[in-house]
Amino acid sequence: MKDVALGIDIGGTNTKFGFVDRDGHLYAETSVPTTKTPPDDIDAFLKYLYDEIELLKKEIAEELTIVGVGIGAPNGNYFTGTIEYAPNLSFRGVVPLVELFKKYYNVPMVLTNDANAAAIGEMIYGGAKGMRDFIMVTLGTGLGSGFVANGELVYGHDGFAGEMGHILQKPTGRTCGLGRRGCLESYVSATGIKRTVFKLLADMNDPTPLRDVTYNQLAAKQITELAHQGDPIAREAFDYTSRLLGQKLSDMVAIFSPEAIFLLGGLAKAGDELLFKPTKRYMEEYMFQVFRDKVKILPSALEDKNAAVLGASALAWKELGVNKHLREMPTPK
């Protein structure tokens, strides 16, 4: 029988989970659609998630004992165990996730922002090993971020520090999932780049297969594939996205002075040519000169190993008092 932590990453599109032992060995992982159950029915979702977790557990030859649970979720509050007003989830308002999920697993349980969980995973198991100051940016349905300063994850006074996706890009701009106007994630995310494409289709006359696709049919992956093939609309969309991301990262560098910035998520898979190099170029262009050529922009070293699941499980092991990799972190209230 093997003791494991259950690591869960709740995203706007998919929820990933896996079993991780105290040494960071990932026994098994899978993903399920976050939108499988009726919108705004958190009880139905958690029951569905529990059933899927138990199915995966039964597929493993070795008998596993879940001794702790770590969860990463948009707007997950480490101090309160609640998801609060997450723009890209159908669960609205304040959701007492830890309290509700303990009905299924009555073990030590901790919740944090999904990007914070990814940052912890990168710091312990990935490319940020040995780094004391770095930023993790997750580019999925929305834009998440986790900030590590002086070797510690920054939670802030109330647990919501590091919401880079909701800093203003344009005060009168696009509406985000929370109804705010001009948030960065409404431009720089899988959803944001789709909106950019449809704006460009109206402004440009270039022929493109994108004109034959409806908004609901279009996926960021298709935009990426067309951009690699030289499609002018898709390439312009990536350039615009990279410019906005580079601008805001230059601001973050001026505040935090990180050693590196890691990009993770579906949009980050666009690679060097479409995203990393142009983002770095724009960041340097807008950078306060004392920081120029000092900050690396890197892909997550855990892209294929699920940084958020590993990070969430690491937090669970920390709650159990056996994770020696993490420095002391504040105790949830």
What is each stretch, according to the model?
Residues D9, G70-P74, T112, M136-G142, ...:
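Short beta-strand segments
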Residues M1-G68, Y78-T82, E99-V107, I124-M131, ...:
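ATP-binding/phosphotransfer module of carbohydrate and carboxylate kinases, centering on a glycine-rich
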Residues K129-V188, K324:
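Glycine-rich phosphate-binding loop of actin/hexokinase-like ATP-binding domains
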Residues T30-V32, P87, H157:
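Short hydrophobic alpha-helix segments
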Residues N14-K16, A117-A119, G142-G144:
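Short glycine/serine/threonine-rich phosphate/pyrophosphate-binding segments
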Residues P87-F91, V110-N116, M136-L139, L298-N306:
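Active-site nucleophile and cofactor-binding loops and adjacent substrate-binding regions
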Residues N75, L89, A115, G173, ...:
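Short, flexible active-site-adjacent loop segments at beta-strand->alpha-helix junctions, enriched
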Residues T112-G126:
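Conserved PLP phosphate-binding loop immediately N-terminal to the Schiff-base lysine helix
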